[in-house]
Design a protein with these regions (language model features):
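Long helical/loop segments within the catalytic core of UDP-sugar-dependent glycosyltransferases
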Residues: 1-34, 78, 85, 160-171, ...
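A short, acidic, flexible beta-alpha connecting loop/helix-capping segment that sits on the rim
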Residues: 64, 190-191
Length: 204
């Protein structure tokens, strides 16, 4: 879904890993080699530099990313998400802050709705709040069911909803952990990172 949204809003479109392509002329004119030599990440570092230089990044509609990540363990997914959020924090702080708003919108309403239902069962929450929470969760389930087609394969609704709950919880946990982060761990190496993603120090 995020990839589709990037295609609709060019201010959020950025180079994306293995799907990225750049001409040799642009590589040399914008000194990409020098940037990458001192940076903690390749694609996201360009997202923080190219817009300031008036360079537009276009998302290729045909570049639908395929991955074999379905078999990955949950800790592998968490480590991947850690890096993605941290890359934004270091390279594009404005998008990282906006991501925090998106995280709150994604995680807090479902959590409050579930707590309201639990409050109704224990007699703590009012009937009105329980009704609103129930209607919200029904609407969320309907919307999520409609979006199942984005996954590229048919998934049972219960599994899709469970995936959303796990993703939202992990997303919130990961984002909170980045608030005070000053670096990241990658393949056993700790990178202390400064403004713009520039590596200040490394240690094994």
């Amino acid at each position: 879904l995020m990839r589709y949204l990037q295609g609709l809003a060019r201010q959020f479109t950025q180079p994306w890993g293995g799907a990225m392509c750049i001409s040799r002329q642009a590589f040399e004119v914008h000194q990409v080699g020098e940037l990458w030599a001192a940076n903690v990440v390749d694609d996201c570092s360009l997202a923080g530099v190219l817009p300031a230089r008036g360079v537009r990044v276009k998302l290729c509609p045909g570049a639908l990313l395929r991955t074999e990540a379905a078999a990955h363990r949950l800790d592998v997914w968490r480590a991947w998400m850690d890096r993605q959020v941290l890359f934004l924090k270091f390279c594009v702080p404005s998008q990282w802050r906006l991501l925090g708003v998106f995280c709150a919108v994604m995680a807090l309403p479902p959590l409050m709705a579930v707590l309201s239902l639990l409050g109704g069962l224990t007699g703590v929450a009012s009937t009105g709040s329980v009704a609103v929470a129930f209607l919200y969760l029904i609407g969320l389930a309907a919307a999520m069911g409609h979006w199942r087609g984005l996954a590229g394969s048919a998934q049972p609704l219960w599994r899709w909803l469970l995936s959303f709950a796990l993703s939202a919880g992990m997303f919130a946990w990961v984002y909170v952990r980045t608030l005070r982060a000053q670096g990241l761990l990658w393949h056993g190496i700790w990178y202390e990172v400064g403004e713009g993603g520039r590596v200040r120090a490394m240690r094994r």
